[in-house]
Amino acid sequence: MARVLKSVALVVLVLIVAIVGIVAFTFLGRMRPTDGREVGGARIVVDGFSSVAVVPLRDGQVALVDAGNDGTGAAILLELQRRNLDAGAVAAIFLTHGHPDHIGAVGQFPNAEILALADEVPLIEGAVGARGPLPRLFPVNPTGITVTRALRDGEVVTLSGVPFRVYAVPGHTAGSAAYLANGVLFVGDSADTARDGTLIGAPWIFSDSQDENRVSLVRLEQRLVADGADVIAIVPAHSAVMQGMGELSAFASANR
């Protein structure tokens, strides 16, 4: 029996080491985001290994793209303080998807409307679990978050004169979204910036379907071109800003 327990413990240890190694390799292969980077009027706030975008609106309000990893929202609140604002100034939070490192501080902003694609609402609210190889290992529990506005693909939400166009990019999760505002395309985890500056798709270990993610990015590029969108920058949640749409177009050309 002791020998069996030792063997099981060894297997578990090997699995843990392997998972940690894969996760570390995944993040080391990305170009890290820069805290305080400003693009298209938005400011990037790094929150641990994730990031949040603060988009200024009129009348002293802001919108957030995602809500970070830290449940206290410390990094976001510090940025608001820098602007002489408090938590009540957050009018809306656009969630790219429902993984924990993107919804952490939602509860810190009671005045905010919570927006996400309809297909992502069950994951955000904790009614279902994520299906990626690593996320599926975690238990499914209610998050205490209520999405107050379920969005449709292609919808435009205008806040204080700032339009946010919604693009469905399923693959990383079932209802992953990208948002285009002031020429900046916020893609969450659906794309990343590699060390060499090229655009790469969502990492397989965290994603429901890497193949679907790839198809979605190709379709996203086609739709942006068809819409005549003036994309000045692409902002992933876990990696550096990419200027213009060139890297997305290169990715799409290579994966059609």
What are these regions (language model features)?
Residues 242-256:
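Binuclear metal-ion centers of metallo-dependent hydrolases, dominated by the metallo-beta-lactamase
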Residues 33-83, 178-193:
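Conserved beta-strand hairpin/beta-sheet module of binuclear metal-dependent hydrolase folds
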Residues 163-168, 174-246:
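Metallo-beta-lactamase
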Residues 55, 66, 97, 114-117, ...:
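Divalent metal-coordination and catalytic microenvironments
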Residues 62, 93, 113, 185, ...:
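Hydrophobic "anchor" residues on beta-strands that sit immediately upstream
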Residues 2-61, 246-247:
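Zn-dependent metallo-beta-lactamase
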Residues 148-161, 166-168:
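Internal catalytic-core helix/loop-beta-alpha segment
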Residues 71-74, 81-149:
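Active-site HxH/HxHxD metal-binding segment of metal-dependent hydrolases
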